[in-house]
Structure formats: structure tokens, C-alpha cells
A protein has these predicted regions:
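Sensory coupling linkers of modular signal transduction proteins
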Residues: 116-152
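Amphipathic alpha-helical regulatory segments at dimerization interfaces
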Residues: 62, 71-78, 153
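Per-ARNT-Sim (PAS) sensory domains and their PAS-associated C-terminal
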Residues: 66, 77-125
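PAS-family sensory/regulatory domains
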Residues: 50-69
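Short, charged amphipathic alpha-helical "coupling" segments at sensory-output junctions
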Residues: 1-12, 137-146
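Sensory modules in modular signal-transduction proteins
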Residues: 4-43
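Hydrophobic helical signal-relay modules used by sensory signaling proteins
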Residues: 12-16, 104, 143-153
Length: 153
């Protein structure tokens, strides 16, 4: 990133974060929500004002707290990204599937990326959680497996 960022570039970046078709959440080290983009609002039904300052675990009881804390601890300690694929862990948050093409799935399959966000001191102070909707890929993989099984029968 350049040393100086023009103010219009900041506006572009904010627009991108809001409009991009992935979930973006920024959490502090106590798992309190600091940033919540429109993808998250649309799929959770919760607006930024409703979630800001609340812990992710209080908002979504279905989150495997021990699992997520282990992943975040690794991100903080190593200062590197961590990933979770839908094949290993189908979802972080149980969102309904709203895709008409893949409507046969009850919930959204998700890939998750955890990014360390360092403060001015260089220490990781926040975590960015990026959620990708993988429902179409999951559905296609299941359909392919079913077709292959049927062809062997």
C-alpha cells in the first residue's frame, strides 16, 4: 500500500468493503464486532448498529467458540492468515441459503479466512473475518458425487 492514501481512495475502499459479495467482519481481541459489511447485514438480518460492540459469540450461539478461538490464537501468535474450508467446517454462522439456483440446500456453506490486523505498534489488535458463500460449489460437488454413485450402480 502506498505511504499516502488519497481521501478519495479511502472512500473507494470503504465502498468496496461494503459492496463486495463476501462477508467482512472486524473483531477486536475480545471478539467484539467493530466492522460489519452489507453482506453480513443482508444474510444475518442484523444491521451494523445492532452488532457493533457485541461479541460474535453472543450474536451467534451456533459458532463453535473453542474452534474459532484456537484459529484466532494461531493467527495472532503467528501473524499469518488462517483458513477454513466448507468441506472441513460447513459454516461459521448458520445463514439460510437464499440462492434460487442452489435452493436445495438449507443453509449457506462457507469458506472463512481470518486475517491479522496489526496496530501502530505492530501487534495484532484486530482480526478480519472474511466469509465466502460456497453453497453453489458444495451443491455441485454433492450432485457430482451422487451422479458418479448412480453411474456405478
Amino acid at each position: 500500500m502506498p505511504a499516502q492514501i488519497d481521501i478519495k481512495e479511502v472512500h473507494w475502499l470503504l465502498d468496496i468493503v461494503q459492496c463486495i459479495d463476501v462477508g467482512v467482519i472486524v473483531l477486536d481481541r475480545q471478539y467484539q464486532v467493530e466492522v460489519w459489511n452489507s453482506f453480513m447485514e443482508n444474510h444475518s438480518g442484523l444491521g451494523p448498529d445492532e452488532v457493533h460492540g457485541k461479541t460474535l459469540f453472543s450474536l451467534f450461539q451456533e459458532i463453535d467458540e473453542a474452534w474459532l478461538k484456537r484459529k484466532v490464537d494461531t493467527v495472532v501468535q503467528l501473524g499469518t492468515r488462517a483458513f477454513s474450508l466448507w468441506e472441513q467446517h460447513p459454516y461459521l454462522m448458520h445463514f439460510k441459503n437464499y440462492q434460487p439456483i442452489t435452493g436445495q440446500e438449507d443453509f449457506m456453506y462457507q469458506n472463512v479466512t481470518l486475517l491479522p490486523l496489526a496496530g501502530a505498534t505492530g501487534e495484532v489488535e484486530h482480526i478480519c473475518v472474511v466469509i465466502y458463500d460456497m453453497t453453489a460449489a458444495a451443491t455441485h460437488k454433492k450432485q457430482l458425487a451422487a451422479a458418479q454413485a448412480a453411474s456405478r450402480a
